[in-house]
Amino acid sequence: MIARLAGRIAEKRDDHAIVDVGGVGYLVHLSQLSLASLPPPGEPAALRVYTHVREDALDLYGFATEDEEAVFRALIDVKGVGPRAAQNILSGIEARELAQAVAQGDVARLTKVQGIGKKTAERLVLELKEKLVALARAAGPARAGAEADVLEQLRTALLNLGYRPPQAEGVAEALRDSAEGRPLDELLREALKLLRG
C-alpha cells in the first residue's frame, strides 16, 4: 500500500496531479485545497496518500496535510460516502472546519458544501462527532487564526497555480472586504473567476 509520494509535480489538472517519482508518473486525486497548495509543475513535492483498491482499479488520493487525510479517512467510514465523494467534500470545506461543524452538530453549515444534503449532513454528525472532536478542538472556537491569514493563503494558492505575484496580490486585495469568515476554497473559486475574466 502506498502511503506517501515524494517527487516532482509533472502535471496539475482540475481534480488530480501527476507526481513523477523516479521516472514513474503517479496519478493522485486531490481536493481543490490540496491541489492549490502544490507547487507548479517541475517543482518537488511530497504528499500523504490513501490507496484505494477496487476489483478493477487502484486509485491514489493525496493530501497536503495530516488533518485532511484524517478527515478523509473518517469520511469514507460513513455509509454512502466513498473516496470520490469524500474528496469532493474536502474540496468544499477545509478539514478542520468540517471537523468543527460536525463536532458542533452544525447541519446548516455542512449542507452549504456541494455534495452534502441534509440527510448526509445528519449522518456525518451522528457517525463522526466523537471521531473528529479532537481535530475540532484544535481548530479553535472561532477559527480566528485561519480568518486572519486567509488572504495570505489565497495569495500563496494563486502563486502555486502559476499566477504572477501582481495578479495574486490584485485579486486578494479585490476580495479583502468580502474575505472575513469565508473559507479559503470559496475565496479561491471567486478569485479564479475574476482572473479568468
From Swiss-Prot:
Residue segments, region Domain II: 65-141
Region Domain I: start-end pairs: 1-64
Subunit structure comment from the entry: Homotetramer. Forms an RuvA(8)-RuvB(12)-Holliday junction (HJ) complex. HJ DNA is sandwiched between 2 RuvA tetramers; dsDNA enters through RuvA and exits via RuvB. An RuvB hexamer assembles on each DNA strand where it exits the tetramer. Each RuvB hexamer is contacted by two RuvA subunits (via domain III) on 2 adjacent RuvB subunits; this complex drives branch migration. In the full resolvosome a probable DNA-RuvA(4)-RuvB(12)-RuvC(2) complex forms which resolves the HJ.
GO biological process, one term: DNA recombination
Entry protein name: Holliday junction branch migration complex subunit RuvA
One of the record's GO cellular component terms: Holliday junction helicase complex
Family affiliation: Belongs to the RuvA family.
Organism from which the protein derives: Anaeromyxobacter dehalogenans (strain 2CP-1 / ATCC BAA-258)
